[in-house]
Structure formats: C-alpha cells, structure tokens
Amino acid sequence: MKQYSSACDENRDPILAIIRREFADARRILEVGSGSGQHAVYFGQHLPHLNWQTSDLPGNHASINAWRAEAGLSNVLAPLELEVTTTHWPATRYHGVFSANT
C-alpha cells in the first residue's frame, strides 16, 4: 500500500539542496524512518551516486517498497527493520545518516 505525505513534497527540494552539498563525497546513506518512501525515491533520483538505505518499522515497508518499485531505482535499497530505541543498528558502515518528518 503506497502512502503519500504532503510534507515530503513540500520540503524535498530545500532538503535536497542541503544533502546534495553535505553528501557530495558520500556513497552510502542510512535513512532513519523512511516513512512513505517518497524522500528516498526523490533523493535517489537526484543523487544517483548514493546508495540510499531505507529503514523503518515493518508497518511502513510496503509503502517504501511500492515507491521503490514504481521508481525502479537500483540505488534505493529495500528497507531494514529499525526501531531506534530497541533494535540493533545495522553493522554496515555508512557515510551519512538522514532523517526527516519522523
């Protein structure tokens, strides 16, 4: 079930301007709380040099995967199950961490 967030559409361009600069030399980014999946897909389209690792609670995975499937981007990865207060963080090394609207 693909979810939609108007907040993602409203803030994606200002956020993109910042992360384009801050993640210019990065390759692997962990998004904490990917929510609907809109930001992941939008940033993946505009920043193809990044491997964007989505993550969220299992209840949001279907929406994240629906946005990923529609976009067909190989650099936006399937969501990890991540509950920041109770689960272990991924062992993979990331060059940056992103979170918005969570």
Question: Which residues does each predicted region cover?
Answer:
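A short beta-strand submotif of the Rossmann-like class I SAM-dependent methyltransferase core
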Residues: 99-102
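Class I SAM-dependent methyltransferase SAM/SAH-binding core
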Residues: 30, 41-87
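A short acidic, Gly/Pro-enriched loop at the edge of an enzyme's catalytic core
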Residues: 89-97
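Conserved class I S-adenosyl-L-methionine
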Residues: 26-35
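Short alpha-helical
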Residues: 10, 38, 59
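Class I SAM-dependent methyltransferase Rossmann-like catalytic core
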Residues: 1-26
